[in-house]
A protein has these predicted regions:
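ATP-dependent carboxylate-amine ligase
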Residues: 3, 12-199
Length: 199
């Protein structure tokens, strides 16, 4: 388990099981093998000396939780680098909230592709950029390039947050689903490239 909210969820499950007659001593051995859901506060470990976290977070509440987790794992003088966008056709009211949280709590932000549906993705990102007061976010439309840029920016002890897509292997476009390699694969590829360049 990693983030505090994962622990709270697990404790809720234990409480429900206990309330339904399962003894705590019977439940505990199963906790040793609990696996995190892909895309839910998923740590990417590929030999790098900085943290990479993939999470589905797309609401102000979930951003608050994942930024709290990032603050707990980032080195004392480390940076938090966030890559995210917002889905089209449904996230209008969430855009200011997620942008403001990132503006207040990140050290660098790259606004990038999400699920545009029938909206113009660049228009969504340009709107989101207007909510930033402290930071000047970069806009890199191509999500793979945005993740590459975040990895290039990261130093030892930093934390990269890849938010909004989780384990999705597609983008929702006007025409339907378009294949995407996933944030996990994009991050691992970017890390492998960065490590190879150091050799």
């Amino acid at each position: 388990m990693l983030a505090r909210f994962n622990i709270y969820n697990l404790l809720s499950v234990i409480a429900v099981l206990n309330e339904n007659g399962y003894d705590i001593d019977t439940i505990l051995p199963y906790l040793e093998n609990v696996e995190l859901t892909p895309g839910r506060c998923q740590m990417i470990k590929a030999g790098q000396d900085f943290n990479v976290v993939v999470d589905f977070a797309f609401t102000p509440n979930s951003f608050d939780k994942v930024f709290s987790f990032a603050e707990s794992i980032t080195a004392k003088n480390g940076k938090i680098i966030a890559v995210f966008g917002a889905a089209g056709d449904r996230d209008h009211k969430r855009r200011p909230g997620t942008s403001v949280i990132a503006d207040e709590r990140a050290d660098a932000v790259i606004l990038s592709y999400d699920d545009p549906s029938s909206e113009d993705m660049l228009g969504i990102l340009e709107e989101m950029a207007t909510y930033f007061k402290r930071l000047k976010p970069q806009i890199i439309l191509d999500r793979i390039q945005a993740i590459d840029a975040a990895v290039d920016m990261a130093d030892k002890g930093d934390t990269i947050l890849l938010l909004g897509k989780g384990s999705d292997r597609f983008f929702l476009e006007k025409e339907g689903r378009v294949p995407y390699i996933s944030d996990e694969v994009a991050a691992k590829n970017a890390i492998a490239r960065k490590l190879a360049e150091k050799c």
